[in-house]
Amino acid sequence: MTKNKNNQPIWSSRIKKNSNNLFRKVGGSLDIDKRLFNEDISASIVHTEMLFKQKIINFKIKNKIVWGLNRIRNEIIKKKFPFDKNLEDIHMNIEKRLFDLIGEDAGFIHTARSRNDQVITDFKIWLKKSTYEINKTLDALISTILKVADKNIKTVMPGFTHLKNAQPISFAHYMMAYVEMFKRDKKRFKNNLDALNENPLGVAALSGTSFNIDRNFTTKKLNFSKPTDNSIDTVSDRDFVLDFLYACSACSIHISRIAEEFIIWNSDAYNLIHLNDKIVTGSSIMPQKKNPDPLEYLRGKTGSSFGNLFSMLTILKGLPLSYFKDLQDDKELVFKSYDQLKISLSLLNDICLLYTSDAADDIR
């Protein structure tokens, strides 16, 4: 049983001196991973139920832990939770609060569980949910582009090669090319669900546990498809992070390409489309200007998505098995790419919606 008192980290039993303040600052991740609170609490409740099912803890302890975790969830939702950055991360904050609420029985929550399998379980649950959210946003964008295409089957525009006029084409045909791109993006995100659906819970630090746990129980309760097969690989694996970040980057490329085309078509040199006043800005000194800033924003943000992917690739390059502190950055990189992609897809959808009513009039 792990004891957590006096705001000390749970790993402090052998460490007699407090950590260097600067290391505490750079080593903590609370500001980043506190968005995992719901996944952490849900996984901890299921883990506790499994411990009771396997007769590792009794009914009274199980109920106390579950009650405490549900109360903590409500405190966080209502913004009444006492976050403490000295406790490193969201997992330790929740555990310390559980000790405050129910006493030393809170220590049973770490029976047959390490932070290694705890964190990666939370992360996979969050990524599964977020993958579905991204694909819902992609569905909305695809639907909008389909409406644009449907209204512009007979709208003729030049097709280009080398940015030179090549052949006359339908504006609908052109926009449908982007539908195909975004459909492929959906497939990329969906394909990663196979890896995300493998349950890490139960592998503990790296080699499992001597407790008689039931990984199939937690797999079913947490909506995974199967337990992971190798405990060392489970703790070390971040392929699912790379796949998610690559999917974000590929999708960002497609967003950047359509943004670039709209910018070019709107330029004085091409003058193929005009942009609604809702998606342009003016100039502080040149009153005639209408600048496509939102589209330029979409184009520019692609670089940060690439950067997050390359950062994760670099972290994993040459990293031995199994867990290292290097891997702590995985969540920050994923959260940044996810947040940016959601905003970009929604903004592009809003821009495309302006074409649904009178797109034919926008093509000159």
Predicted segments with their positions:
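Single conserved hydrophobic/aromatic residue that forms the stacking wall/gate
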Residues: 355-364
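Short, charge-rich, low-complexity alpha-helical interaction segments
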Residues: 15, 344-350
